[in-house]
Amino acid sequence: MQCGIACIQMVCCYFGRKYSTEFISQYCHSTTEGVSLLSISETVKEIGIKTISGRVETNQLVRVILPCILHWNQNHFVVLYKVKKNRFYIADPAKGLVKYNLEEFKKHWVSTQSDGEEKGIAMFLEPTP
């Protein structure tokens, strides 16, 4: 199963919307390399979930409504579903449920560093009525 499609399925389930992999695949434009963040965003929009994506700092993830989809290791997508006491709880389509401390989390997620700021790519989601 492709990680982007699996992440879409997980967040839809969280919001009480259960869709099969086949159904999601109809909307999600996939290539041999998987799906893009744009394709994930367009797919969830089609099924009633608004998104905002961008580069954010780790400390901003503590203040947002979860779950959110993260670009992981520059080539994978995971769902961040909880942050508690500097522990980051990840639903990884390849590994299952995994817990990371701050440093481990940053190794996988941070994609840019400049002027002392470390940022990674996140997609925040909100269901529409």
Language-model features: where?
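Noncatalytic regulatory segments and standalone regulatory/sensor domains
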Residues: 28-35, 61-73, 77-129
